[in-house]
Amino acid sequence: MYNSAKQLQRVLTAREIRKTFLDHFTVNHGHKFVRSSPVVPFCDPTVAFVNAGMNQFKSVFLGTAAAPHKRVVNSQKCVRVGGKHNDLSVVGTDGYHHTFFEMLGNWSFGDYFKREACAMALELLRGPYNIDPGRLYVTYFAGDKVLGIPADLECFEIWRSLGFPASRILPFGCADNFWEMGATGPCGPCTEIHIDHRPDLGSVEQRAKLVNAGRSDLTELWNLVFIQYNRHADGSISQLPAHHVDTGMGFERLTAVLQNKSSNYDTDLFTPIFDGIQQAAKTPVYSGSFPDGGNAAVLDTSYRILADHARMVTACLADGMLPDQNQKLRRVLRKALNISEHVFAHDKLLTQLVPIVVETLGEAYPEMAAKQQAVIDLICHEQEVYKNLRESSSKAFAEVLMEFPNLDDIDLMECPGFVPAYRELQMQRCKFSNNTIPGDFLYKLTDTYGLTEESFLKLAELENMNCDLERYRAEVSLAKLKAKGNQRETAGGSLCDLATEQRIAEAQAMLTKRLTPTDNSHKYTYSFDKESDSYQIPPLKTRVLGMLLNDAEVSRTQGSRIQQPFTDLISIVTAGSNFYYESGGQQSDGGKILVSNHQQPDHPHSLDVIGVKHLNDCVVHICKLSSPTDAFQLAIGDEVELQVDAQQRQLNTCHHTATHLLNAAIRSLFKKVTYQVSSSVSSDQCKLELGLLGKRIQKTDVQLIEDLINRVICSAAPVEVQLLSAAEVLEQNDITMVPGEVYPEQGLRLVNVESPELQLSSKELCCGTHATNTSELSCFCIVNLKQTNRARFAFTAVAGQAAENVLKTAALLRHRVDLLEKQFQTDKLTNATEAELQTIRHNMLHTDIKLPYAFKMDTLERITEMLKRIKDSSRTTLKEFVDVEMRTLLQEKPLDTHPFILHYITSSALVEEIPLQRATKLCPDRPILVISVCDSVVKARCCVPEKCITEKFNASAWLQSFADTFNGQIAAPKGQNPQAVCNMKGRRVSNLFEEQLEQAMSKAHAYAKLYL
């Protein structure tokens, strides 16, 4: 049993213990309380979870950010499930490992140091916590001759002066008492306070030998780190100009000590959760037994695992982490679901534990209470995904899971090629170096198995491997190049081969490494002129810092050296720039650079800016001569004038603000768990892909979204921008952030649009350019909606002038369709009527014409109804079209080059009842899968000759790969072999079924290519 020897008059609750710690430092010692950062790393891409109290202050120690206060105290939420700190595998088997835990800590940033830190710690332990110092041991750094660092005798003397006898002050080496952030950077000695839970087992001398020996009855309680050195790349150590203190004490262990418990799980942090499990599942009460403790130990271990995982899942989901984007979280969540179902026979148990977790932790972390329903919704969604995955799993898939149990964490229904890709990775990984999947292999995964970049990144995470994304993207570019006959079009319409473009990119990177950074703050200097209804962007005069002519660095260039003025590229780096470079999903600006013309001073030379890059803190303007002239001259140090294309910037700006309003409107209207997957902003349109749980967006929803945004535009709400630090951002609760995004420590731009009367609030971190007032957007409309995943929707929208153009196009089309409908009503049909309807329908579906989405859907329904009426008079003739279409197809695709047929019968759109058997009978010599779509109903039939049937390739399996996209039901005709022939029952689809059809056929094609 943990025993502090001095029995407290009253056992403190966990809440009181946490509050006592925080009050000790804030009230008694002038510290500032800083709330816990989310467990999602905010400014640190090096870790998957916040796993220590110091994570949010790492940049302060590195010197890249200012300290929020000189003295800080907090209780930090931490998660450890992988990497160096991996507690997942042992959770539940002992009394002190957890995936989620709290770290109590106090910090000094250049203020107090060793003596004050030790004194404050001992004061708390001996005073408010009433721990007998006779149960405490302390350690100090013994020094390291190799590093040339002496023993921390100062620390030894401090503890002596605070009343510790020398027998309780123990020296240890680097492994135990020297802290380092990394291979280089801040580091320093530490002192640890250990507590003896069983002092009756031996003398001080005997027990002292057990410190740092891995004993459960003598454990570390508090670690005080003194950051006073800096390790350099050559391994040498030097003193830091300012010294810091970083301390950490595990809250769960401290609570067990103060509540006189032998296990962290016996404290009031966990017992309410155990009670909730027992009451819901009606299982035997938790008894606290551990492995080797009999039959009860198995159940008790499950109690501990489920309680721990419920805390971890609740904390992560409340902080905005998503299982779909973090496989470690999904693994823990699914393990908790499995235990709930298989051990406690209660499939809703995990969601019932969330309110209990919130009750135990919500006072310290109010975001948990605020997000409680969202957490429950996310768990329910993940449970449904997991359930569907298991239910739809074939025998073959079950065998795969037995072979590769790790794949249980992946939604394989979204990517049928994942399993064979995983198998190939297992075979090939021994050939890879540095635990990195090479770019050419990544490209093979996408090309052969249909994996997306997102899915192969999940694959790499599953195997704890890295990906050579740079080489992969080069392979993708090379494939595009080959497809276009070794030529591809670059920005601005010029042609250059990939090798040249790569050389230019490498030269740009080398050039910018040696130059001073560009002042790019001028890109935010612009205003809106109401009279002209346009943006005013003042030109910027600045000096040239560096220059390339194609891939060659030059100090001076002139017209005579530019052999091909419309294709030769000039890369110019300037001291300042008002051009926006592509970032935050927003495309870069276009415009011109004006260069002095010494022959005609009033007519400067002009360079077209066709691209803008940001490299090594420099802005690179990629230019071409606007017109060929030998008189053109430009040298480093020359003054130039940068002119941004204001019209393009205005469209980009309006579309970026529109993207924020769209995101906010969806969250406001539907009150569902919503998260951003991706966004892109251009002068043509904006795209926003969102995860939206528990809601299927319909045509009427689109109209609601548009209406709300247009009312916000009419309300002329101001768009405000605030500059914040990361610490200031974390103090706010209502900011929309992109899950998994890593933000800088300083200079974060918070874009805020508030329309209280319309109950819409948009607060997003964003580096893009934005309108100054919503009225500048003029109007807004959604032009496309696509469901990209089980719970993901991609919106395409336009605003401003682009939206006005779309509405004008819609008005013209509405007028024409109205006239055609009048012809139907008066029976004044001509032979050209059907042709015109088909042309309109084709243009709406297959061209780049933009129309309001709701209008487009309504119009397609009207056209479909008119075409249906036309078909009634020619049904028999049209059925013959099917035979003609199939015979033509088979002639064009002979057996020797096309071992299988996968075909959508286009003429099926004209005939209400096409017997697909009629089509498959025409192809008896090879596997065939044919699809028809008529009156918004999709059907399919598959036949496989007996000679082609295998366990993995047969009619049922092949058709299933197609049907999954539509959630279609398949079955063999009565009395027939499902491996030889199979039908998909008709499924209703929208008028915009082409995208779904393309996706389904792509999966079926990949399946046949892989297994036939």
From Swiss-Prot:
Catalysed conversion reaction: tRNA(Ala) + L-alanine + ATP = L-alanyl-tRNA(Ala) + AMP + diphosphate
GO BP term (any one): alanyl-tRNA aminoacylation
One GO MF term: ATP binding
Keyword Transit peptide carried by entry: yes
GO terms under cellular component: mitochondrion
EC number(s) on file: 6.1.1.7
CDD domains according to UniProt: AlaRS_core
Pfam families registered for this protein in UniProt: tRNA-synt_2c
Disulfide bonds: none
Keywords: Aminoacyl-tRNA synthetase, ATP-binding, Ligase, Metal-binding, Mitochondrion, Nucleotide-binding, Protein biosynthesis, RNA-binding, Transit peptide, tRNA-binding, Zinc
Cofactor(s) needed for function: Zn(2+)
Compartment(s) of residence: Mitochondrion
Quaternary assembly: Monomer.
Described function: Catalyzes the attachment of alanine to tRNA(Ala) in a two-step reaction: alanine is first activated by ATP to form Ala-AMP and then transferred to the acceptor end of tRNA(Ala). Also edits incorrectly charged tRNA(Ala) via its editing domain.
Name by which UniProt lists this protein: Alanine--tRNA ligase, mitochondrial
Source organism of the structure: Drosophila melanogaster
